[in-house]
Swiss-Prot record:
This is GlcNAc-binding protein A. The gene is gbpA. Probably interacts with GlcNAc residues. May promote attachment to both epithelial cell surfaces and chitin. It holds the Pfam family GbpA_2. One of its GO terms (cellular component) is extracellular region. Residues 426-468 form the Chitin-binding type-3 domain. It comes from Shewanella oneidensis (strain ATCC 700550 / JCM 31522 / CIP 106686 / LMG 19005 / NCIMB 14063 / MR-1). Gene3D superfamilies: 2.60.40.2550, 3.30.70.2150, chitin-binding protein cbp21. PANTHER family: CHITIN-BINDING TYPE-4 DOMAIN-CONTAINING PROTEIN (PTHR34823:SF1), GLCNAC-BINDING PROTEIN A (PTHR34823).
Amino acid sequence: MPKLTQLSLVTLALTAGSTLVSQTASAHGYVVSPESRSYACKTGSNVNCGAVQWEPQSVEGASGFPESGPADGKIASAANGAFSPLDEQSPSRWSKRDIKSGWNDFSWQFTANHVTRNWRYYLTRQGWDQNQPLSRASFDLAPFCVIDGGMVQPPKLVTHNCYVPEDRSGYQVILAVWEVGDTTNSFYNAIDVNFSSGAVVPGEWTDIGDINPSLDLKAGDKVMTRVFDANGEQSAKQTQITIADATQGAKQNWPFLLASAINAQQPQLKAGQKNAAGVISPVYGKNEIFAAPKSGLERVEVSFDIAPAPGNQLNVTSLADDYTIVDGAAQVSFDVSTNADMQVSAYLFSHDGTAAGYVTQAVNNTSASLVLDVVAPKAGHYHLQVKAEPKQGEVIQQNFDLFLKDQATAPDADFIFPEGIKSYVAGTKVLQPKTGKVYQCKPWPYNGYCVQWSPTATGFEPGIGNSWTMAWTEL
């Protein structure tokens, strides 16, 4: 490894008559080339970054690294809780920029160019743990480049030419530290880079796009590439996948599927993450898109075709054709189910339109049993109106007709239970001699329970068994 290089600041001169910034001024800045982790959040190369996407210049913390400064696990965010997403770490979490060993330029953009003590550049060790937040153990704690700031105010744009060590390969992180001269703070910029094996040579595949895990998709959604060269979009080079289910649509999963499809369909493109040997393979999470040498391809974008959400649905089941008035009282019972959060209300009207009962219940993407007490029940025709009011969308209304019958006019039974049990189907009516009442077999999918009976297995016996209401409706 070359000796520690002390470089003079490039183009560091104050014009005559200029004044220093106030000691209380706010110093801000970030590395723009190669893109720092925070700046890539601003440009969109990195996603799900939180507040730093609007303030990449503000990743500021206590000075003194590595002896003091941000704690291990919080180095990338400078221990600033507002920017804690920067501390997330995995091999595929962050966009990377290709870099070569040897001389490289590092450019800072300052929004408030404060008096500067120095800039320092650190590099992760070969074999560092890419799945753990950055710590001092991740880095070679001797900086590979130090720039003396001279305790003067730098220009708004500064470029340092530094010699990057030769004994690294694959994914590494450069920690760029700007130590200001008149406060106790420094600015910390993590730079995610990828070393090829050996020096970068002409003819390598070029990074021209990203597949960012930006959102969860649902079944029926489509995600596709848009490929551009100097002449515009090349539709023949588009790759598209359709999401089959929620698992495929998870934002860490579909980028892997799209990258795999690109690699299978497009000979001039490769998608994935580049390993230490330069091999590009799909990963779960963020993937890069690379163009073949001399392909002429310049840019790849990712777009979505989001399938419309299914409409609000209300299902009413277990509603009988008629209900019996017993001792001057009657109830109308039935089941409802919804596919969203809805307030389900049922209104009962007599044949002449007189209100005869009401019940309401919140039902959120599930099923519920509703029981409506009939007001002053009389034998005859009734109209049931069931309304479901979703939090979003139009009200759903379904209408049903039913009859109330006096006990004496209860419907005739088809069988006396358990005679003919093997022939019971939905709608079959049986007289239960143990209760003297008539019961009707419920419609599918419950009618299968009606034939499940033996002298030693009476769970679904109408009016008697522990679970008889799953199979039967009392008439």
